[in-house]
Amino acid sequence: MAALNEFVSVVVSDGSRDAGLAMLLVSRPPTNALSRQVYREVIAAADELGRRDDVAAVILFGGHEIFSAGDDMPELRTLRGAEAETAARVRRDAIDAVAAIPKPTVAAITGYALGAGLTLALAADWRISGDNVKFGATEILAGLVPGGDALARLTRVAGASKAKELVFSGRFFDAEEALALGLIDEMVAPDDVYDAAAAWARRFLDGPRHALAAAKAGVDAVFELPRAERLAAEQRRYVEVFSAGQGGDAGADPHGG
C-alpha cells in the first residue's frame, strides 16, 4: 500500500489473490468532502494507477459508509476570484484524471454520492451501488452549477431532459432510479458493494492490457473528439495494438475473427 498524502490512497493487491486489482481510496471522514487538496491527491493517485505495470483494473471507493457528499462547501465559500477559478480547474482535472486511467475502472458506491461525488463516480467506467444509496446533482441547492464536466457526463448517460430535471431540482434520488436511468450498472445489498465491484473488475484482470486501453480510449473519444480526429486516433491505436500483438502480446485475431 502506497499512501498518497492525507486523504487519498492507492492500494494494490499483494498478488496472493486478485493480482493486478487496485483501489483508489478516498478517506476524509465523515463525508469524504472533496477539497482542493483531495482533488490534487486524486490526480496523483490516478496518474500512479495509470503508470503502474502491476495494476490491471481499479476500484474507486470511499469506504463502507459513504462514497462522497460532494465539494467541501465551507472551503468553497471562502474562495474569491482567481482562487475559485483554480478550484474549478483542479476539480475538472481530477475528474478527467480518473476518467483517463487507461484501465477498466469500477466505482463502488456506498451511502451517498452527491454533487461532485456523483460526478466522480460517473468518471468510472462502471458503477456498483448499494440499494440504500442516495444520489443527487445537488449543486443548485447551494446556488451553484455542477462542475468538472458533470453536465456532459450526466447528460451522456441520462439524456438531456432527465439531466435538466435532476440538475434544476437538485433532488435526491435512490439507487433504483439510478439503475433505471443507467447511472449505475448494478445494485446490491449495502454490505456487498465492494465485493460486487471487485467481481466486476476481476473479469478484466487477465485481459490484453494494450487492447483494453485502446478500446477504452476509442469509446471515450466518441464523445470527446471531432469525427475526423477520432477516426485518425482510432486508426493509430489499431496499428499500435496490432503491432504489439505481432510481438506476442495479443491472443486474438485483430480483425475480430
Curated annotation (Swiss-Prot):
It is an enzyme of class 4 (lyase). Its EC number is 4.2.1.17. The record marks E139 as: Important for catalytic activity. SUPFAM superfamilies: ClpP/crotonase (SSF52096). InterPro entries: ClpP/crotonase-like_dom_sf, Enoyl-CoA_hydra/iso, Enoyl-CoA_hydra_C. It comes from the Bacteria. Keywords: Fatty acid metabolism, Lipid metabolism, Lyase. One of its GO terms (molecular function) is enoyl-CoA hydratase activity. It catalyses: a (3S)-3-hydroxyacyl-CoA = a (2E)-enoyl-CoA + H2O; a 4-saturated-(3S)-3-hydroxyacyl-CoA = a (3E)-enoyl-CoA + H2O. One of its GO terms (biological process) is fatty acid beta-oxidation. The keyword Cell inner membrane does not apply. Could possibly oxidize fatty acids using specific components. Belongs to the enoyl-CoA hydratase/isomerase family. This is Probable enoyl-CoA hydratase echA17. It comes from Mycolicibacterium paratuberculosis (strain ATCC BAA-968 / K-10) (Mycobacterium paratuberculosis).
